[in-house]
């Protein structure tokens, strides 16, 4: 079920405050966050946000095409290494 329009998008307060402070100072610094559920809003464009994936913070440069998506969509948490090759010789 989608979020109600009257509520607006969810963005963590601490993250929004950091971005607004950087916009006022006209600075570009990497912002570290654990908030994967935060929605990308237009004020974030041009910033680099390091999103935690469970092991490390992955830096993500925010572009205009990412608006409306969640930060966690761009930091994969699982590492798929492919299916194991069936090796019949090693079974004998």
Swiss-Prot record:
Alphabetized PROSITE patterns for the sequence: RIBOSOMAL_S19
Main location: plastid
Coiled-coil annotated spans: none
GO-annotated cellular components: chloroplast; mitochondrial small ribosomal subunit
GO BP annotation list: ribosomal small subunit assembly; translation
Taxonomy, superkingdom: Eukaryota
A molecular function GO annotation: rRNA binding
Similarity section: Belongs to the universal ribosomal protein uS19 family.
PANTHER family in the cross-refs: RIBOSOMAL PROTEIN S19P FAMILY MEMBER, SMALL RIBOSOMAL SUBUNIT PROTEIN US19M
Name of the molecule in the record: Small ribosomal subunit protein uS19c
Species annotation: Physcomitrium patens
Gene this chain is encoded by: rps19
């Amino acid at each position: 079920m989608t979020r109600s329009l009257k509520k607006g998008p969810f963005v963590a307060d601490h993250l929004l405050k950091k971005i607004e402070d950087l916009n006022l100072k006209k600075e570009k610094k990497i912002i570290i966050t654990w908030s994967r559920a935060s929605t990308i809003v237009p004020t974030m464009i041009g910033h680099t946000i390091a999103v935690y994936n469970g092991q490390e913070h992955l830096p993500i440069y925010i572009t205009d095409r990412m608006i409306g998506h969640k930060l966690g969509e761009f930091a994969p948490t699982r590492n798929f290494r492919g299916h194991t090759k069936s090796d019949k010789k090693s079974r004998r």
